[in-house]
Swiss-Prot record:
UniProt gene name: DBP9
Pfam family, one: Helicase_C
Source species: Saccharomyces cerevisiae (strain ATCC 204508 / S288c)
Keyword Lyase: no
MF term (GO), any: DNA helicase activity
Record's catalysed reaction(s): ATP + H2O = ADP + phosphate + H(+)
Name under which the protein is recorded: ATP-dependent RNA helicase DBP9
Protein EC: 3.6.4.13
GO cellular component: nucleolus
C-alpha cells in the first residue's frame, strides 16, 4: 500500500470519528497531526479498534490510496508503546514487529512513513529497513541494537535468519505484517514465508496483518498458518471507483515504429498536461525511447532494476516533487503465477507462451559475439505496484503488459484518491508485427489477445477502454523527422548509454552518499534527466517549424527561421582584414600604419 499525504479524499474518509477517539499515545497523535491527517479513513476506523481493543488478526482488502499503511502501523506502534511502559528501561526485548513487503521500493516507502510516526517516540521505538542499500557490516552493527520494528522483503529477512544466526531476536515478536500480500505471493515468496514461519513464535500471541488491494485463494494458506480467527475487512470499492476514480482509458492500434512517432508528437506538442509515467517491457526499450526523445530535445529520466537502490528512491522522490515531468519506467517483472480470473481455461497454453516471451530477446537475431552489457538486476525491484508516484496525470503503456493483471497495476499509478487520470496503451496489430526490425519487441506479438482480455476485465468493473482518436495527417507530417532521429539511435548507442548511466548513478549512489547526508541541499542539484548523448544529436530536430504545427498553434510566421548547417559568422570571419600575419611572427608596423 502506498502512502500519499492528503491524497485520500472524500470517498475514503470517515468523518464520523477522529484519531483521538482511539485513545492513542499523545506522541503518536502529535505525529499523525504533523503528517496532516485529522480524520481516519474507512479502513483505519474499522481496523484500528479491532487490532487495539480486541487484539484481532486483520485481513484487509481495500483499494490503492485508502490508507492501509496507517491502518497497521498505528496499532503496531501504539501496542509497542504500551508494552514499553510495562518493562524496565534496561531490559532487552528484541524485535517486536516485522513488516514484510514485496519490493525494496515499497520497503523504503513504508519505512519513511514509519519514521514520521515514531518521530516523538524514537527513543522507545527504533526502526530499521533491512532492504536498504547498505553493506553487511553496517547492517550487522545496526542489528546489534535490536530495533523494535524491522521493515524488509521476505527474501532479505530469510537470508538474515539463515546466515546470521542470532542477529535478529524474535522470541518476543508481537506483530507480523505482510503488505501487498497478493504481490508477495506472485513474486514467488510463498516458500520464503513458510521458512520464516519456522523462526516465529506462532504459538504465542502473535498478531498478524495481511493487507492487499485484492484477495484470492492463495491467501488461504497464509491465513491458516499465521492467523487465528482473523477479522476480514472487505470494502466495496466499485461505487467509489465509478464516482471518484475518474480514470479515462484509451488504446491506440499502431505499428511498432509509429509508437515512437506518436510519443514524439504527444510530448513535443505538449498534448498531455502534467506528469506522465511511461512503461516499457525491458531495459533496452527504455534507453532507446529516452535517446530518441533526446534527439528532439525532450527530457526524461530512466527507472529500472539495474540502477542502485539509492538512485531509484531519489528518482521517485524528485518525480513526486515535480522535478521531472516524464519518467520512463521498466516493468520487466516476471510474474511467477498468472492470476487473471478473466482468462479462459482454453488459454492456459497461451499464458505459458506469454511468460516465456518476457524472457526472450527483443529481436529474433542470433546472439552477437560482441561483448554485451552484463549488469546484475535487482530481483526485489518493482515499480508497477505499490510505489508511491504522486499526482501522475497520465500512464502511457508504450509496451502493452503481458497480462491483464499487470495492466491493472500499471494504470493504478494514476487516478488515485479520487483524482482524475488518463491511461493510454499502444497496441501493435498482429499484421504489423515484425515489419520494422529495429523497433520490434517480441511480446508485441500477443498485444491484440492481451487487449481483448483487458477490455473484458475492465468491463466487469464497469469501466471502458476507448480508441484514442487523433488526426493522422498531422502526425504524418512529423514522420520524416522521426525517421531521421530514430536512425541515429543504434544498438551500440543504447549499450553506451546504459554504461554511462550506470557509472553516473553508481558514483552518485556510493561515493557521494555520505556527502549528501551532510549537505542535503546539494542533493537537490543532482538530476537524473540529463542528456546521455551517446547518439549523434541533430540540433535542428529539437525545434518544430511552424509549418508542421496545426493552424491553431502556429505563430505569425516571424519566428520561423532557417537553421543553417554551418555557422555563417565563422565562415565570413576569414574575409575580414586583408593583411595576414607572416609565418615568422614578425609584422612591419609602418606598413599597417594609418
Amino acid at each position: 500500500m502506498s502512502y500519499e499525504k492528503k491524497s485520500v479524499e472524500g470517498a475514503y474518509i470517515d468523518d464520523s470519528t477522529t484519531f483521538e477517539a482511539f485513545h492513542l499515545d499523545s506522541r503518536l497523535l502529535q505525529a499523525i497531526k504533523n503528517i496532516g491527517f485529522q480524520y481516519p479513513t474507512l479502513i483505519q476506523s474499522h481496523a484500528i479498534p479491532l487490532a487495539l481493543q480486541q487484539k484481532r488478526d486483520i485481513i484487509a482488502k481495500a483499494a490503492t490510496g485508502s490508507g492501509k499503511t496507517l491502518a497497521y502501523l498505528i496499532p503496531v506502534i501504539e501496542t509497542i508503546l504500551e508494552y514499553k511502559k510495562t518493562i524496565d528501561n534496561g531490559e532487552e526485548n528484541g524485535t517486536l514487529g516485522i513488516i514484510l513487503v514485496p519490493t525494496r521500493e515499497l520497503a523504503q516507502q513504508v519505512y519513511n512513513v514509519l519514521e514520521k510516526l515514531v518521530l516523538y517516540c524514537s527513543k522507545d521505538i527504533r526502526t530499521l529497513n533491512i532492504s536498504s542499500d547498505m553493506s553487511d557490516s553496517v547492517l550487522s552493527t545496526l542489528l546489534m541494537d535490536q530495533p523494535e520494528i524491522i521493515v524488509g522483503t521476505p527474501g532479505k529477512l530469510l537470508d538474515l535468519l539463515q546466515t546470521k544466526i542470532n542477529s535478529i531476536s524474535l522470541n518476543e515478536l508481537k506483530f507480523l505484517v505482510v503488505d501487498e500480500v497478493d504481490l508477495v505471493l506472485t513474486f514467488g515468496y510463498q516458500d520464503d514465508l513458510n521458512k520464516i514461519g519456522e523462526y516465529l513464535p506462532l504459538k504465542k500471541n502473535l498478531q498478524t496483518f495481511l493487507m492487499s488491494a485484492t484477495l484470492n485463494d492463495d491467501i488461504q494458506a497464509l491465513k491458516q498458518k499465521f492467523c487465528r480467527s482473523p477479522a476480514i475487512l472487505k470494502f466495496n470499492d466499485e461505487e467509489i471507483n465509478k464516482n471518484q476514480n475518474k480514470l479515462l482509458q484509451y488504446y491506440v492500434k499502431v505499428s511498432e515504429f509509429d509508437k515512437f512517432l506518436l510519443c514524439y508528437v504527444i510530448f513535443k506538442l505538449n498534448l498531455i498536461k502534467g506528469k506522465t509515467l511511461i512503461f516499457v517491457n525491458n531495459i533496452d526499450r527504455g534507453y532507446r525511447l529516452k535517446l530518441v526523445m533526446e534527439q528532439f530535445g525532450i527530457k526524461s529520466c530512466i527507472l529500472n532494476s539495474e540502477l542502485p537502490v539509492n538512485s531509484r528512491q531519489h528518482i521517485v522522490d524528485q518525480f513526486n516533487k515535480n522535478v521531472y515531468q516524464l519518467l520512463i519506467a521498466t516493468d520487466d517483472t516476471e510474474y511467477i503465477k498468472e492470476e487473471d480470473d478473466e482468462i479462459e481455461e482454453g488459454h492456459n497454453t497461451e499464458n505459458q507462451e506469454e511468460k516465456s516471451l518476457e524472457g526472450e530477446p527483443e529481436n529474433d537475431k542470433k546472439p552477437s559475439k560482441k561483448k554485451k552489457v552484463q549488469v546484475k538486476k535487482d530481483k526485489e525491484y518493482g515499480v508497477s505496484r505499490g510505489v508511491d508516484f504522486k499526482n501522475v496525470a497520465c500512464v502511457l503503456n508504450f509496451d502493452l503488459p503481458t497480462t491483464a493483471k499487470s495492466y491493472v497495476h500499471r494504470v493504478g499509478r494514476t487516478a488515485r484518491g479520487g483524482k482524475t487520470g488518463t491511461a493510454i496503451s499502444f497496441v501493435v496489430p498482429l499484421k504489423e508485427f515484425g515489419k520494422h526490425k529495429p523497433s520490434m519487441l517480441q511480446t508485441a506479438k500477443k498485444d491484440e489477445r492481451i487487449l481483448s482480455r483487458i477490455i473484458k476485465q475492465q468491463s466487469k468493473l464497469g469501466l471502458e477502454l476507448q480508441p484514442y482518436k487523433f488526426d493522422q495527417k498531422q502526425v504524418e507530417a512529423f514522420r520524416y523527422r522521426m525517421e531521421d532521429g530514430f536512425r541515429a539511435v543504434t544498438q551500440v548507442a543504447i549499450r553506451e548509454a546504459r554504461v554511462k548511466e550506470l557509472k553516473q548513478e553508481l558514483l552518485a549512489s556510493e561515493k557521494l552518499k555520505r556527502h549528501f547526508e551532510e549537505n542535503p541541499k546539494e542533493l537537490q542539484s543532482l538530476r537524473h534527466d540529463k542528456e546521455l548523448h551517446p547518439a549523434r544529436v541533430q540540433q535542428h530536430l529539437k525545434r518544430v517549424p511552424d509549418y508542421l504545427l496545426p493552424e491553431s498553434a502556429r505563430g505569425n510566421g516571424t519566428k520561423v527561421k532557417f537553421v543553417p548547417f554551418h555557422n555563417a559568422k565563422k565562415r565570413h570571419s576569414h574575409k575580414k582584414g586583408r593583411v595576414s600575419k607572416p609565418k615568422n611572427g614578425k609584422v612591419d608596423p609602418l606598413k599597417n600604419f594609418k
